[in-house]
Amino acid sequence: MSIQVKNIEKHFGAFHALKNISLDFPEGQLVALLGPSGCGKTTLLRIIAGLESADEGKILLEGADATNIHVRERQVGFVFQHYALFRHMSVFDNIAFGLRVRPRSTRPSEAEIKKRVTRLLDLVQLGFLADRYPSQLSGGQRQRIALARALAVEPRVLLLDEPFGALDAKVRKELRRWLRTLHDELHITSIFVTHDQEEALEVADQIIVMNKGNVEQIGSPREVYEKPATPFVFDFLGQANRFDGQYHENKVELGEDQIILPNVSEVPHGKVIAFARPDELHIHAQPQDNTIQATFLREVWIAGKVVAELQDRNGRLIEIALSPDEARLHLFRPNQTVWISVSQLHLFADHVA
């Protein structure tokens, strides 16, 4: 089912939560609403579900106006961050619940319910837990059961609000892979809310980056990461070193340092915001042309990766990615003067300045 959001406005008192939001969610895609807390992503999801009403605008489901249709009639499956399973019911009964409370005219027979629940338990790979209770399950297992319960009523769209936010890092990673595989099998239109950039980049077909009630960028994971449209998107997606400076005639002046770049025609001369990923910067023990002078602070070893922390002459903290071999080869010392070269510098006009 395709979903269209047209000119949605939402206020909570004086707080403007959503500002004229218009979006298309293609049928069969897994779309991430990505942004920091308070950006409006969960509010938008709840409006699509029918759990919240908009001040202005429309929600179209399969081209039909669903703005004033009750949540029960939208055929939406919803999965929350906190599993919301019924503690007094078995896993089987939790999944069957939505089917058993239907009006008699649309309620399946018990034989059909058993068949459907068994199929869903197999789908989420937890058939052996059918007779257990939520308190006997791990967090990851509970979330799979919550997803199976949402799918039991055969929704036309699946909405997930930070579905893995309450789980530890390893379980989150496992469930991300599982969700992507499950979606490829079912091809149900799905929207999930997350503030986790890695989660969105790994799972989604399309990412909608939100900030302060606005949409900053829409694109594939590769597009939003490699070609961020705004400084916010660049800074929010992945690690980034930010520099504020002046751009003029192929030179970026960064306080006491300057970097010469190839012609950057799309950026006007004047104040700019410049970004470089940690793997786009390189450390040198000896002075080099076209470099930034800095002081080496320390190395941080994380899961086979090395991050060098430095401070430039303007007091900015800079992070540079090193391979373990590079770190062992150079053996930089705290407070050592080093020089930083830049393989790529991404410039944005500083409209605020």
Curated annotation (Swiss-Prot):
Keywords: ATP-binding, Cell inner membrane, Cell membrane, Membrane, Nucleotide-binding, Sulfate transport, Translocase, Transport. Its EC number is 7.3.2.3. The keyword Secreted does not apply. One of its GO terms (cellular component) is ATP-binding cassette (ABC) transporter complex. It holds the Pfam family ABC_tran. It is a peripheral membrane protein. The keyword Disulfide bond does not apply. GO terms for molecular function: ABC-type sulfate transporter activity; ABC-type thiosulfate transporter activity; ATP binding; ATP hydrolysis activity. It is found in: Cell inner membrane. Part of the ABC transporter complex CysAWTP involved in sulfate/thiosulfate import. Responsible for energy coupling to the transport system. The complex is composed of two ATP-binding proteins (CysA), two transmembrane proteins (CysT and CysW) and a solute-binding protein (CysP). Belongs to the ABC transporter superfamily. Sulfate/tungstate importer (TC 3.A.1.6) family. This is Sulfate/thiosulfate import ATP-binding protein CysA. The lineage of its organism: Bacteria, Pseudomonadati, Pseudomonadota, Gammaproteobacteria, Moraxellales. The gene is cysA.
